[in-house]
Amino acid sequence: MSFEHHTGDLESPFRRKLLLGTAALSAASLLPPQAFVQQALAQQFPTAKVSTTGLAVTDSEVTVGILHSVTGTMAISETGSVEAEKLAIEQINAQGGVLGRKIKFIQEDGASDWPTFAEKAKKLLVNDKVASVMGCWTSASRKAVLPVFEQYNGMLYYPTFYEGLEQSKNVIYTGQEATQQIIAGLDWVQKTKAAKTFYLLGSDYIWPRTSNKIARKHIENVLKLKVLGEEYFPLGSTQFNSVINKMKLSKPDVIYAIIVGGSNVAFYKQLKAAGVDLNKQTLMTISVTEDEIDGIGGENIVGAYACMKYFQSLDNPNNKAFVSAFHKMWGDKTVIGDVTQAAYLGPWLWKLTVEKAGSFDIDKVAAASPGVEFKGAPEGYVRIHENHHLWSKTRVGRARTDGQYDLVYETANLMEPDPFPKGYQ
């Protein structure tokens, strides 16, 4: 059973049935309507039935974990994820929670350090016994925690677009994998810009290196085009003048940039200072969302293209309500990027899956995940595939001076996720 996201929807058939079935409880009928529904749900789903493996579930609460970097070089990217997850939890609680239980969260800081992520994941699963974790950003952090989630049988909702080549019973990947972003984006830029030469850049860790490996294979083997250069920089790097000079000399049709976190601020400022006009030099990024532009400054990246599945400027009712709620909770000046939106999907998809499973038990939630759909997604609509990735649209945006993106392209239909594309292993 899946549920649409309607705030305060007390009149759904499911809830009407509950209300009718518990109308005889005269004491409960004195409660406010939302509390009445919550109590009725909790009684229909007793703790002993919905939590059989010792998770942090009581008759009135269920505890989840939030695990992101709020310090270090990745804080610029991950803070939005934390804010989105807290907003989703607040909205879910306002609707009565999950199976009649309010969501409580325990937040840990991965501190932009992969061993710290693994240590905190173990704490959340073993000590706190959380029913799920919303967390990680970089692939390095996800790779660090994955053995922990598999060993202790936890459930991670991972929000970042990533390189693919992974699938786990213990992870729901709410961002895009390579075929939905890297390959689709390269096809668009080649076709639209008649591009023949590319220069690949990235931060020096697993996601950019693997993504550029996939990009190079696609450029050379499928599109039959040329890569003029490929360079990597340690996380937190601020010196890009040398590679900028090389690119100015080699004149690639497309700069393909997968630099992450705070390094983006230095890179785009130095690019502009070197006289590179992104309205004339095509640059495509798959790592700069509105969150990063907030630090970069719109004037330093205007004209660049980004291939994502979500932009804050998307014009649909779900997104307007989401942006409004986000600004109300976190301030009008906050911006919302692709990963922030994908992080917002995590608590909602978990809630819907728990309700479909009728249980918080990890194995039952994992088994119930395929086919769960969230019609209230700000990006429009998403559905969980059998491979635990999401069906979603691919979009291309162009950076504006105000730090937002203009939507310039989107796929007509949802793209099926394929984390293991043939020929790209």
Region locations from a protein language model:
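Hydrophobic alpha-helical segments within soluble ligand-binding/sensing domains
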Residues: 49-50, 117, 174-198, 209-210, ...
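C-terminal segment of N-terminal export signals and the immediately downstream linker at the start
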Residues: 11, 33-65
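Extracellular/periplasmic bilobed ligand-binding domains
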Residues: 212-307
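N-terminal secretory signal peptides
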Residues: 1-17, 21-41
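Extracellular/periplasmic periplasmic-binding protein-like sensory domains
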Residues: 271-344, 355-360, 408-425
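Solvent-exposed, acidic/polar segments of extracytosolic/periplasmic ligand-binding ectodomains
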Residues: 45-48, 373-425
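Beta-alpha junction/loop-to-helix N-cap segments that form part of ligand/metal-binding clefts
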Residues: 50, 76-83, 95-165, 233-240, ...
